[in-house]
């Protein structure tokens, strides 16, 4: 396992926060969308950012 520096951990924390916020925003927008195609696109974007979050989180273990 690679040991991360304090700077790397700080950057990772910032990226995790950003991705988490994007997931929440796109899920909220998807819930409010009336057009099915827009709703699907927004849900897809939320899933993409959730994947980014999961990938970054996996770097912590």
Task: Label every model-predicted segment.
Residues 1-61:
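His/Met- and acidic-residue-enriched segments that coordinate or traffic transition-metal cofactors
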């Amino acid at each position: 396992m690679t040991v991360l520096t304090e700077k790397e951990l700080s950057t990772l924390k910032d990226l995790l926060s950003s991705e988490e916020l994007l997931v929440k925003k796109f899920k909220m927008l998807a819930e409010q969308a009336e057009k099915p195609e827009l709703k699907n696109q927004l849900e897809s974007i939320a899933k993409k950012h959730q994947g980014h979050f999961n990938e970054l989180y996996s770097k912590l273990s």
